[in-house]
A protein has these predicted regions:
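Structural register within alpha-helical repeat arrays
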Residues: 1, 33-34, 67, 104, ...
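Alpha-helical segment of the N-proximal tetratricopeptide repeat
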Residues: 1-22, 33, 39
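Residue-level signature for tetratricopeptide repeat
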Residues: 4-5, 37, 68-70, 107, ...
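Structural motif corresponding to the intra-repeat A-B loop/turn of tetratricopeptide repeats
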Residues: 6-8, 41, 74, 111, ...
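TPR-repeat structural position
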Residues: 10-11, 44, 77, 114, ...
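TPR alpha-solenoid repeat register
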Residues: 30, 63-64, 117, 172-173
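Intrinsically disordered, compositionally biased tail regions
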Residues: 208-241
């Protein structure tokens, strides 16, 4: 029930997760679901505690990227970067490594390190013309970082590539591309303006070779890895908006 409601009604999902915790707090799947429900409601301190509990129960490393993103949500991008440089990252599958790269780039941006964020996102997965579940989000994040750095032409190119790969509409890349092109969309049912709506163009596909080596944040850019189990559940800090 929690998983079904997270996207449609995150508040209701969170309420269900609290009930589930009261009934089965020793079940790892319940702790993980509670973590995602709290995460969806930006209750990052609570989410981090639940993810840590689930990981202790199972030893599963898959939650590592979202745990790092919780650190970002709590205003601790340095800790997120610590986690990006930890040995656990090499144990993640390809999707997990891409997710970790996205989190690390976000942490760099939190610290106003735009150039470092751009470099962090540059990877074989970004350049590949193979479309994977993570491709649209990776290209979108790269385009957004380029735009924030004032590199508008490059940003437009990568928003176009994100549009090409966004088969399920997981990003608003088409809207961002249209905005850069000066295109204004109107309501199709507005008879007075329907004939004036131009059509946005989509740029060319990316092309590059793929590589399979795992990515880990450069050791020079991160501090010594901390053991997440050293920190017990903390009173919830003010979450990032």
């Amino acid at each position: 029930m929690v998983a079904k409601l997270i996207d449609e009604d995150p508040e209701q999902a969170y309420a269900y997760s609290k009930v589930a915790l009261r009934l089965a707090s020793r079940v790892a799947a319940v702790r993980e679901a509670a973590g995602f429900a709290a995460y969806a409601n930006q209750k990052f301190s609570e989410a981090l505690a639940e993810f840590r509990a689930a990981r202790r129960m199972t030893g599963n490393i898959e939650l590592w990227p979202v745990m790092a993103d919780c650190e970002r949500g709590l205003g601790r991008p340095e800790k997120a970067l610590d986690m990006a440089g930890a040995p656990e990252v090499a144990k993640l599958d390809k999707a997990g490594q891409v997710e970790m790269r996205l989190v690390a780039a976000g942490a760099r941006r939190d610290m106003d390190q735009l150039d470092a964020a751009i470099v962090t996102l540059q990877s074989p997965e970004l350049a590949s013309n193979s479309v994977q579940p993570w491709t649209a989000r990776l290209r979108y994040a790269y385009a957004d970082a380029l735009l924030a750095a004032g590199r508008e032409d490059e940003a437009r190119e990568w928003f176009a590539k994100a549009v090409e790969s966004d088969r399920d509409g997981s990003t608003d890349a088409s809207d961002r591309l249209a905005e850069l092109d000066g295109v204004e969309f109107v309501d199709a049912f507005d008879e007075t303006e329907a004939d004036e709506a131009p059509v946005a163009e989509v740029g060319p596909k990316a092309s590059a070779s793929d590589e399979d080596e795992p990515w880990v944040e450069d050791a020079e850019d991160v501090e010594e890895f901390y053991d997440e189990d050293d920190e017990e559940f903390e009173p919830e800090e003010k979450d990032k908006g």
